[in-house]
Amino acid sequence: GGDLEIGADVFTGNCAACHAGGANSVEPLKTLNKEDVTKYLDGGLSIEAITSQVRNGKGAMPAWSDRLDDEEIDGVVAYVFKNINEGW
């Protein structure tokens, strides 16, 4: 798993503009809560599916693979997965 401290920093610096507190400011129905992620994310709620979404983007969400390194992506995925499962 990724480093949660790195993940928290990456989330705050890159993701929170749209996803603060697990929300989605661009597409309000597609939040980062467990029910929505399970329903809307390609592949459902899994580390692999979240990693793919972060790396490749989809819809309004940009791909981050050219801006974040593997350690940063693994960290932010671990951070998001933990928070989804704990209800932010």
UniProtKB/Swiss-Prot annotation:
Q: Which GO terms describe its molecular function?
A: electron transfer activity; heme binding; iron ion binding
Q: Which UniProt keywords apply?
A: Chloroplast, Electron transport, Heme, Iron, Metal-binding, Photosynthesis, Plastid, Thylakoid, Transport
Q: How does it assemble?
A: Monomer.
- Tell me which Pfam families the record gives: Cytochrome_CBB3
| Similarity field | Belongs to the cytochrome c family. PetJ subfamily.
Annotated compartments: Plastid, Chloroplast thylakoid lumen
Describe the function of this protein: Functions as an electron carrier between membrane-bound cytochrome b6-f and photosystem I in oxygenic photosynthesis.
- Protein name, per record: Cytochrome c6
InterPro entries from the entry?
Answer: Cyt_c-like_dom (IPR009056), Cyt_c-like_dom_sf (IPR036909), Cyt_C6 (IPR023655), Cyt_C_IC (IPR008168)
Q: How is it modified after translation?
A: Binds 1 heme c group covalently per subunit.
Q: Record-annotated residues binding heme c?
A: C15, C18, H19, M61
User: What does the record list as GO biological process?
Assistant: photosynthesis
Principal subcellular localisation of the protein: plastid
Q: Which organism is it from?
A: Bryopsis maxima
Offer a single GO CC term for the protein. Answer: chloroplast thylakoid lumen
